[in-house]
Amino acid sequence: MFIRAPNFGRKLLLTCIVAGVMIAILVSCLQFLVAWHKHEVKYDTLITDVQKYLDTYFADLKSTTDRLQPLTLDTCQQANPELTARAAFSMNVRTFVLVKDKKTFCSSATGEMDIPLNELIPALDINKNVDMAILPGTPMVPNKPAIVIWYRNPLLKNSGVFAALNLNLTPSLFYSSRQEDYDGVALIIGNTALSTFSSRLMNVNELTDMPVRETKIAGIPLTVRLYADDWTWNDVWYAFLLGGMSGTVVGLLCYYLMSVRMRPGREIMTAIKREQFYVAYQPVVDTQALRVTGLEVLLRWRHPVAGEIPPDAFINFAESQKMIVPLTQHLFELIARDAAELEKVLPVGVKFGINIAPDHLHSESFKADIQKLLTSLPAHHFQIVLEITERDMLKEQEATQLFAWLHSVGVEIAIDDFGTGHSALIYLERFTLDYLKIDRGFINAIGTETITSPVLDAVLTLAKRLNMLTVAEGVETPEQARWLSERGVNFMQGYWISRPLPLDDFVRWLKKPYTPQW
């Protein structure tokens, strides 16, 4: 019995909650980092796309105005048809205006005009090769802001072309349908800014927020700023949700694993109390007449949730948790419970092969457990054979005394899985043993030219010299059975004869005519 302090459950719960919270925080932080990186990549892509778009757009506009520069030598009447056509086929151009001797003299929108450029657009510097300004409106469209861009004629002083451009920022320039998580874009020319988040012109000093990206368009005095939140509500919600779920899962898993680790044998004891263990019996036959002369008793665990638990898994677990003794004691009780039914169908002298772990063999209760098992079985009907496997090193002196005592009370001893590395030749020299059980690995090699085959021959020769009876495990084919019979192996078991069966199925199997084909 394992005793824990009264606050064990509270400490365990607190530990698992702390672990869950720490994992939740860690996962949330990692998710924020992932979201931040995704936004960074997204903003880089967006600003690069914007820059490429504007570079291409203004390069095309420059090419168009270069074709219009010669028209500054003509009259408005001569220039107007081409000027109007160019404006019509240039994207987002409201109007092209020709300038000569610092005066505007022809517009694609209004025709002839005679207004000094510095009066019409004071912000433009006619002496620069390229200059830009943002206007609150134009004569033809007074309520909508526009960008004006000036291109000086390189061959004619104080002459050139300027264009008034529509500002259709969001759909045309910045693909807002693809960028649902940014706040807006601002175009900055000089000290004036026009943004998607305000309908009026702004002084650049009013843009107090830090942009996530900023780029200058080559060749023109235009700066583009991209504004966005560091995190969106979706980012925050998803990070906390993922962190919360991860923390919950880790907390529950921590509680389960720590419960198992800190309460040794709890599952085994619970399974014993709830009668989840049962016995399966695998018949052992003599190799000549194929009569049932014994059976190996195997413990099985049918878990209500996990189903059948593999024997290796729960036996290794029981050994690691120091629960192999109570588990074997429970096996003895199950055998005693089935004995009355087995007595009806099995002849006198049938052998019961039972696996015993070294920990149980050397335990204080071992002799009492064996005596209790013997007295619980029908008198003089069954022969108990204890199967020993070297999972741990046996204590030689103590084992010798125990084996002598077992023989004195009528219990026989078999060495199990011989030749697999679990057992050693030294056993055969130092201990008085009755049976040698040959591992299935050797049986599977029968009929194949492997190094295992001559080893099996040597094992059989050794057993005969020591006057030990031999039992072959894992016989699955008639060829293997025939080979073993011809080599003088005494007994065999395996799926060729029968798989391990629960009590009722084993009784039904015994009552059927047994005629295996050689």
Swiss-Prot record:
- Do you know what upregulates this one? Expressed at both 28 and 37 degrees Celsius during exponential growth. Repressed by RpoS.
**Bilayer topology:** Multi-pass membrane protein
Q: Name one GO biological process term.
A: regulation of single-species biofilm formation
Spell out the Pfam families in the cross-references.
Answer: CSS-motif, EAL
Which key words tag this protein in UniProt? c-di-GMP, Cell inner membrane, Cell membrane, Hydrolase, Membrane, Transmembrane, Transmembrane helix
User: What enzyme class is recorded for this protein?
Assistant: hydrolase
* Protein EC: 3.1.4.52
Q: Where is the EAL domain?
A: 261-514
Entry's localization field: Cell inner membrane
What chemistry does it catalyse, as a reaction equation?
3',3'-c-di-GMP + H2O = 5'-phosphoguanylyl(3'->5')guanosine + H(+)
- InterPro entries in UniProt: CSS-motif_dom, Cyclic-di-GMP_PDE-like, EAL_dom, EAL_sf
Q: Which residues cross the membrane?
A: 16-36, 236-256
* Organism superkingdom: Bacteria
Identify the stretch annotated as signal peptide in this record. none
The molecular function terms in GO held by this entry are:
cyclic-guanylate-specific phosphodiesterase activity
**Where does it sit, as one GO cellular component term?**
plasma membrane
General function of this protein: Phosphodiesterase (PDE) that catalyzes the hydrolysis of cyclic-di-GMP (c-di-GMP) to 5'-pGpG.
Q: What name is this protein filed under?
A: Probable cyclic di-GMP phosphodiesterase PdeN
Q: Which organism is it from?
A: Escherichia coli (strain K12)
Q: What is the lineage of its organism?
A: Bacteria, Pseudomonadati, Pseudomonadota, Gammaproteobacteria, Enterobacterales
